[in-house]
Amino acid sequence: MPRNPARIGLSGHPHRLISHEKEALIVPDVSEKKSVTYADAGVDISRGDRAKERIKFLAQKTFNRNVLGGIGGFGALYRLDMQRWKNPILVSSADGVGTKLKIAFELGQHHTVGADLVNHCVNDIAVQGATPLFFLDYLATGKLDPEVTEDVVSGLADACKANGCALIGGETAQMPGFYADGEYDLAGFIVGAVDRDKMVTGAGIKPGDVLIGLPSTGLHTNGYSLARKLLFEVAGYKPTQYVTAIKEKAGAALMKTHRSYLSVIQKLVTAGLTTGMAHITGGGITENLPRILPKNTGAQIETGSWPVLPIFEHLRDLGKVSEEEMMRTFNMGVGLIAAIPAAKFTRAKNLLDRAEEKFYVIGRVVKGEHRVQYT
């Protein structure tokens, strides 16, 4: 037995020896240790409070008369304007930015990912005829950086304001040990409204309807895991490296902001010129277009009827990616498809031309299998 068993412990730390009939337990003596705080565990509440103060001002810029209360309540309050809709249907969607964030981390470019998220969510409900009402975000990180958080939320707020949507709340989570240093995840939730008799569901789509495609700005928010593998692993590019094949830097090509189609969608819907619309996201045209097609109808898409962006051509060449894989992974330069009854096509064309909205006739709705055929 040591001379002073009460002072012997692991790693030289003092312990108390508690004797029992069958065994002796060594209990750490914490009387001399300092108090451990939440900040010691990696969660700095004061830093979080500073970030919230920065965020509050940005969010308030998006408020309208229907937002009740401010940022900081347990729940965000929004008044549904019953004079605006006779028989309102709420339409909601939730999404994230995906591994596009990895490029944002490397480039230190955080403002645009906020816009990516809002525009993606706006498009998802707008294709059903809904007007965006309010948006909430979720940002999680290992160690909170108030400046980065402000940059992200600034992008969210700017996009919300541009889409007529109020940023009424959200969650900023500090999760030490869960995320790598300097990284975060970002997700959003949107709610919009549409009168029941104005919903756009695709139920009215018929064989013979013309399919028009509206151009995308790039990958938008989908296919980034494959794109990153091809550009950064296979080709060995750096995000800041100029790539001759696409005539711009690799990172710049990948960080182009997800386009909002709200304005053009509202024009088509208000004029009663579309029977259904598809937001082309993960799964490409192959997976997304059938989501709006009625039973016993399919889509015939004419490849080559729209210009494929250089970034997609280069990705295909780098990985010898099959056409089938490309079409079900990327938007290939088409971010939105609208079905237009043949009898209304001229009116739709004139409307889009007046609005200076570029579009391409990319195919037709056909009778038959519920799938996309490429010709």
Indicate residue ranges for each PLM-predicted region:
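Short hydrophobic transmembrane-like helices used for membrane targeting/insertion
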Residues: 1, 8, 18, 26-30
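Short hydrophobic alpha-helical segments enriched in small aliphatic residues
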Residues: 12-16, 21
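Glycine-/charge-enriched secondary-structure boundary and capping motifs
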Residues: 26-40, 57, 148-166, 179-186, ...
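Short, acidic Gly/Pro/Ser/Thr-rich loop/turn segments
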Residues: 48, 84-85, 97-100, 195-198, ...
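Glycine-rich phosphate/pyrophosphate-binding loop regions near the starts of catalytic domains
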Residues: 57-217
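Mobile "lid/hinge" segments at catalytic clefts and subdomain interfaces of large enzymes
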Residues: 205-233, 237
